[in-house]
Amino acid sequence: MKKSIIALATAFTVLFSTNTIHAKTNNPELTAIEIADSQLQSVYDAYFTVKDALIKSDSKLTSAKAKDLLTAITAVKMDKLKSNEHTVWMKVVKKLTADAKSISATTDLKKQRETFKTLSKSTYDLIKVSSPTEPIYKQYCPMADADWLSKEKAVKNPYYGSSMLTCGNVVETIK
């Protein structure tokens, strides 16, 4: 009886693990979506770290994070992007790259923040077609006359840092 139970348990284990492996490998659409999403996710994550460094008014950290952003941009495999993402990517990739290079090449906080304006515009255009899994908030500062993107609804202004940390408002929620 004990051997029968062990044999039955082994058979079920093999049956279910084979079925799971088959389901994972025979679903290329699921795999492609995961790859496409991850292609731009690293760009978005790096953008947010640049924004956070600007909030801290840390020009050296901002420069370093912009280098990480540049690495993420160059790592994107265009052939893995969804059609609508690819279309926008082709329109913004040169500007994204130039802005990331510009921010990484200086420790002048004023120049970094000025360049961040156009970096944010390009990132917004891209994230708008990416269907993020979590809400992204487009925020606006009237004093800087500039937008930026945030994962948090609470305003933390990258253009003025601690001197005007909460200046601005949410103008759009991207879902």
Model region roles, listed by residue range:
Residues 31-175:
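Mature extracytoplasmic or organellar-lumen-exposed domains after removal of signal/transit peptides
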Residues 1-27:
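Bacterial Sec-dependent N-terminal signal peptides
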